[in-house]
Amino acid sequence: MAPVLPVVLPLQPRIRLAQGTWLLSWLLALAGGLTLLCSGHLLVQLWHLGTFLAPSCSFPALPQTALAAGAVALGTGLGGAGASRASLDAAQYPPWRGVLTPLLVVGTAAGGGLLTLGLGLALALPVSLHQGLEEGLQAALAHYKDTEVPGHCQAKRLMDELQLRYHCCGRHGYKDWFGVQWVSSRYLDPNDQDVVDRIQSNVEGLYLIDGVPFSCCNPHSPRPCLQSQLSDPYAHPLFDPRQPNLNLWAQGCHEVLVGHLQGLSGTLGSILAVTLLLQVLVLLGLRYLQTALEGLGGVIDGEGETQGYLLPGGLKDILQTAWLQGGLAHKPAPEEAPPDEEPPKEVLAEA
């Protein structure tokens, strides 16, 4: 069987291959560490923002996959650096001969597979982020008033912290608060005629007002924050509804969070692409180094040329050989014929 992608490697190219693989292995370990840091940071961000993501949103699968891929890439880089350095010394290389094959298999199957999957998720999942945040923020606004309802007691605090931290208001703008009841019913006076009229005028029996929570207010505004009667141009003569950003945060939280999380996922995707490229180069270098040294008995400075290759034969030949070897291994051995029995001694004596 002819080897796949054979390369003739004299002494100096073998040494340069080992040195180059050692350098690329350390770069791969560095890229794997950066992948771990970026995916861990994105996981922490999603843990804090999990309340505002719909349960059906699959975006958290990206940092989880990238975390596993970064760990495998880090291990492959460290193992490749040790193996390539040991290959320069005939006394240190023998212990690594049994490690290289499992390292190549794990690096190719697990590392390459996870990195490719993570890169694909980084390109595809940000699309689902829009819908996940849309549903999550809508639910957060609807449960803002439920401070005494089990399971939603922290909804008000989390939404206030979100708007104050990210300088946003509502889902797509401050007017989103006009369509939900964000004032708890325990603060409403049932004897107040205005409260009764507002509740009765709504089909769902909600108390809706044209106001926003205080967390929507911009503390850097040069004037006092106006929270109520925002749709009435005569209620606040100094307030222009066409320019609410003078008092309130102009952007909605959906736009801010999408930009923030997509920026993190874009950075993570770029690191995954670089890590995948380094992973391929390191695995190729280790494979050619392994096959070249096997032809020299594990001595890199052995005399003469040797041949490095990717596979000992074509995929069809490898599968055929494995099939034949497996068939021979399961084929029962031929039964030995029983030895001829010697005639009894009495018969021999009579003869």
From Swiss-Prot:
Localization per Swiss-Prot or TrEMBL: Photoreceptor inner segment membrane; Photoreceptor outer segment membrane
Per the UniProt topology annotation, the Cytoplasmic ranges are 1-19, 85-102, 287-351
Q: Spans of biased composition, class Basic and acidic residues?
A: 342-351
The record's keywords, sorted A to Z, are: Cell adhesion, Cell projection, Disulfide bond, Membrane, Sensory transduction, Transmembrane, Transmembrane helix, Vision
Q: Name one GO cellular component term.
A: photoreceptor outer segment membrane
Q: According to the lineage, what is the superkingdom?
A: Eukaryota
Chain intervals for the UniProt region annotation (Disordered): 329-351
Enumerate the GO terms in the molecular function aspect.
protein homodimerization activity
- List the PROSITE patterns hit by this protein, alphabetically: RDS_ROM1
GO terms (BP aspect): camera-type eye photoreceptor cell differentiation; cell adhesion; detection of light stimulus involved in visual perception; photoreceptor cell outer segment organization; protein heterooligomerization; protein homooligomerization; protein localization to photoreceptor outer segment; regulation of gene expression
Q: Which family does it belong to?
A: Belongs to the PRPH2/ROM1 family.
Name used for this protein in its record: Rod outer segment membrane protein 1
